[in-house]
């Protein structure tokens, strides 16, 4: 009887539903750095694995005032390259229309790197830390940049659940470079929602109730709130009106820090 119980318990663990993961994030930084990540999913190249592409493998391009650095492997796949550039243009164009001109100019200083398929990256992330990049075998030139690590995954996610993913990543850059990750107002609001518990179980875009990705840390909280305020997020609150009713304090902070109270 005891053996049957143990086997049943093991089977229940084996077939447990995986924890929902968000594909885009700020990468984990070494101790003492300001960036964090919910679940480290990337490692530096190990024995027998290809290293990250060298700087010479990237060609410079431009899109609506943003510098693009495109991996030559992606350029070689002409159709995929075109699709990715079209989607990047589409998202950046929306950003130029919905944000104040001053903020757009600040975001245009953030380069965007495009990969065909980097096995050590998820689809899209912002890199705040040169030391983390160096320690994990990445190009340190990617520091303070947005990195699209997988072209196909980027296209898939933007079509199915995250139409404003570049806004999310550029919000990380703005938070890091212009507000500071320890911005007092954002930290206060983040601590308040953790205590209130009203982000612990929210509607996800697939109809499931899940823990909101914003609870990861104050960085994701700000980026997720920015997505909801200016576009559409994949976690409730999905849009601006819902953010205003669900989290009025953060609604006002987003308005203020993006310059909409002037």
Segments from the language model and where they lie:
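N-terminal low-structure segments adjacent to metalloprotease catalytic domains
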Residues: 5, 20-115, 119, 128, ...
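Bacterial N-terminal signal peptides
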Residues: 8-18
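Alpha-helical hydrophobic/aromatic positions enriched in membrane-embedded helices and signal peptides
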Residues: 57, 160-164, 212
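Metalloprotease/metallohydrolase-associated module, dominated by Zn2+-dependent proteases
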Residues: 134-143, 149-152, 156, 190-262
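Bacterial N-terminal signal peptides that target proteins for export
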Residues: 1-7
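Acidic/His-rich structured neighborhood in mature extracellular/periplasmic domains
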Residues: 71, 81-195, 238, 251
